[in-house]
């Protein structure tokens, strides 16, 4: 199987030195339109697929992102691994704005307005999500960040809030009491849907601020976030480039068979319309 690596993040990530045969592709999905056109290319002999999570020009709120269409589109284009590049607030003193975190856990504080599963409409599945990121991909991202010269923290918990408003000070301190490392607004349900689609998922989290808990630092603001992101875009590209060289073509992780024992609905009971709609996701099992 051809290795195809997806990157979900800012719209500037695909403007990468060495990316060849760059094309924009409109992808239709049963779940509506993705955030924007997908950008494909070849980097060091590996096919890449990029998607600006919030659309070009940052048009979509975290709540408005069509996560199902985005992940389905990645699957349709043959992606087997997704690298998520995300701006986050630091919830720990030692994670300084400008540092990189490769989280390995999530806490979901989003609400029911986000569609967080491909299933329903006559088919029931329960994926294992105890370890929500791909350990192999995350290890490659950590090594790639070290190689790029980043100050990088391995592991930690990303708490995903609904937004779009930032936290109150009371909320920020509550989340710190949970022992989380960073806070963001986008990686859930993205990670859940990637697991349902049997796509490996790993995160490059760019710490931009201390949210609003740190008494010695300014509270989080959009202008501060943008300033740090601009500083870190080159670093994120370097990490991605290094990771692409490291990632094995073959997958030996459980992500590739996440649905093997997850679907509990009798095959004969699944409506034909649902089977057709989810054929790309469940076709090999039903």
UniProtKB/Swiss-Prot annotation:
GO biological process, one term: purine ribonucleoside salvage
Sequence positions that bind substrate: 185, 209-211
The keyword Transferase is assigned to this record: yes
Complex and partners: Homohexamer. Dimer of a homotrimer.
EC code: 2.4.2.28
Coiled coil: none
This protein's UniProt keywords: Glycosyltransferase, Purine salvage, Transferase
Free-text function comment from the UniProt entry: Catalyzes the reversible phosphorylation of S-methyl-5'-thioadenosine (MTA) to adenine and 5-methylthioribose-1-phosphate. Involved in the breakdown of MTA, a major by-product of polyamine biosynthesis. Responsible for the first step in the methionine salvage pathway after MTA has been generated from S-adenosylmethionine. Has broad substrate specificity with 6-aminopurine nucleosides as preferred substrates.
Family stated for the protein in its record: Belongs to the PNP/MTAP phosphorylase family. MTAP subfamily.
Broad class of enzyme this protein falls into: transferase
One GO MF term attached to the UniProt entry: S-methyl-5-thioadenosine phosphorylase activity
Cross-referenced InterPro entries: MTAP (IPR010044), Nucleoside_phosphorylase_d (IPR000845), Nucleoside_phosphorylase_sf (IPR035994)
Annotated Pfam families: PNP_UDP_1
Binding site for phosphate: 11, 53-54, 86-87, 186
Species name: Geobacter sulfurreducens (strain ATCC 51573 / DSM 12127 / PCA)
Site annotation Important for substrate specificity: residues: 167, 222
Identification of the protein by name: S-methyl-5'-thioadenosine phosphorylase
A GO-annotated cellular component: cytosol
Pathway as given in its UniProt record: Amino-acid biosynthesis; L-methionine biosynthesis via salvage pathway; S-methyl-5-thio-alpha-D-ribose 1-phosphate from S-methyl-5'-thioadenosine (phosphorylase route): step 1/1
Catalytic activity: S-methyl-5'-thioadenosine + phosphate = 5-(methylsulfanyl)-alpha-D-ribose 1-phosphate + adenine
């Amino acid at each position: 199987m051809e290795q195809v690596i997806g990157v979900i993040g800012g719209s500037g990530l695909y403007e990468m030195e060495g990316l060849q045969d760059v094309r924009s592709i409109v992808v239709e999905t049963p779940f509506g339109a993705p955030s924007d056109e997908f950008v494909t290319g070849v980097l060091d002999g590996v096919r890449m697929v990029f998607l600006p999570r919030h659309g070009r020009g940052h048009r979509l709120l975290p709540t408005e992102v069509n996560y199902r269409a985005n992940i389905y589109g990645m699957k349709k284009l043959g992606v087997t691994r997704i690298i998520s590049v995300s701006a986050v607030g630091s919830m720990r003193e030692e994670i300084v704005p400008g540092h990189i975190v490769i989280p390995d856990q999530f806490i979901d504080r989003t609400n029911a307005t986000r569609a967080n599963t491909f299933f329903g409409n006559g088919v029931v599945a329960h994926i294992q999500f105890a370890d929500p990121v791909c350990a192999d991909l995350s290890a490659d991202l950590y090594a790639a960040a070290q190689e790029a010269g980043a100050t990088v923290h391995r592991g930690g918990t990303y708490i995903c809030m609904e937004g779009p408003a930032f936290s109150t000070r009371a909320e920020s301190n509550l989340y710190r009491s949970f022992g989380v490392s960073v806070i963001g607004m986008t990686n859930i349900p993205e990670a859940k849907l990637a697991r349902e689609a049997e796509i490996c998922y790993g995160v490059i989290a760019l710490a931009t601020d201390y949210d609003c808990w740190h008494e010695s630092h300014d509270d989080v603001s959009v202008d501060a976030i943008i300033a740090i992101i601009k500083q870190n875009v080159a670093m994120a590209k370097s990490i991605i480039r290094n990771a692409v060289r490291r990632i094995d073509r073959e997958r030996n992780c459980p992500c590739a068979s996440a649905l093997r024992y997850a679907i509990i609905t009798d095959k004969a009971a699944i409506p034909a319309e649902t089977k057709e709609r989810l054929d790309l996701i469940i076709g090999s099992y039903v």
